[in-house]
From Swiss-Prot:
Enzyme class label: translocase
GO cellular component terms, A-Z: plasma membrane
Source organism of the structure: Citrobacter koseri (strain ATCC BAA-895 / CDC 4225-83 / SGSC4696)
Bilayer disposition of the protein: Multi-pass membrane protein
Gene of this entry: rnfA
Location of this chain's protein in the cell: Cell inner membrane
Subunit structure, interactors included: The complex is composed of six subunits: RnfA, RnfB, RnfC, RnfD, RnfE and RnfG.
Superkingdom: Bacteria
Family: Belongs to the NqrDE/RnfAE family.
Enzyme nomenclature, EC number: 7.-.-.-
Primary role: Part of a membrane-bound complex that couples electron transfer with translocation of ions across the membrane.
Gene Ontology biological process terms, A to Z: electron transport chain
Pfam (any one): Rnf-Nqr
Protein's UniProt name: Ion-translocating oxidoreductase complex subunit A
Length: 193
């Protein structure tokens, strides 16, 4: 049980996909201008990363390894992610049309989010079992969502703050992301993996 707790805390805080592994930077910078959009994108990404992680493990374990098709792993995972994203897009369109309009082009772009493919490939490379794969996918997504929501809240405050002209816009956003990364480095002594 403590192994699963350490995996969760370690993935969310210590080995955060955005701030430590630099995966998922495109939606991190692109969708984080408004808190509402960041929360919606975080929920959609959490659903996709968790489901894609589970599906990728199942396909790798039951199809690719037994048939000795490991060289098709990346292609198979990309196809799995595309199917999961299309399913998510249909669910969001039916359940929340307002969120669907807010997310716009970023919802189909989850397919190309390198964090989603990264979590599927890292699960296999780290040798996780089914439960660990599901938890790793979920905790990576929670870490991604946490950082994106925090960053969106900070960016909303910075939009009305008195920021010097050369630092307005993306410059202050990158400085803020760097400071967040430094803050998350403080968690590195918390968990020894």
């Amino acid at each position: 049980m403590t192994d699963y707790l350490l995996l969760f805390v370690g993935t969310v805080l210590v080995n955060n996909f955005v701030l430590v592994k630099f995966l998922g930077l495109c939606p991190f910078m692109g969708v984080s201008k408004k808190l509402e959009t960041a929360m919606g994108m975080g929920l959609a990404t959490t659903f996709v990363m968790t489901l894609a992680s589970i599906c990728a493990w199942l396909i790798d374990t039951w199809i690719l390894i037994p048939l000795d098709l490991i060289y098709l792993r990346t292609l198979a995972f990309i196809l799995v992610i595309a199917v999961v994203v299309q399913f998510t897009e249909m669910v969001v369109r039916k359940t929340s049309p307002a969120l669907y309009r807010l997310l716009g082009i970023f919802l189909p772009l989850i397919t190309t989010n390198c964090a989603v493919l990264g979590v599927a490939l890292l699960n296999i490379n780290l040798g996780h079992n089914f439960l660990q794969s599901a938890l790793y996918g979920f905790s990576a997504a929670v870490g991604f969502s946490l950082v994106m929501v925090l960053f969106a809240a900070i960016r909303e405050r910075l939009a009305v703050a008195d920021v010097p002209a050369p630092f307005r816009g993306n410059a202050i956003a990158l400085i803020t992301a760097g400071l967040m990364s430094l803050a998350f480095m403080g968690f590195s002594g918390l968990v020894k993996l």
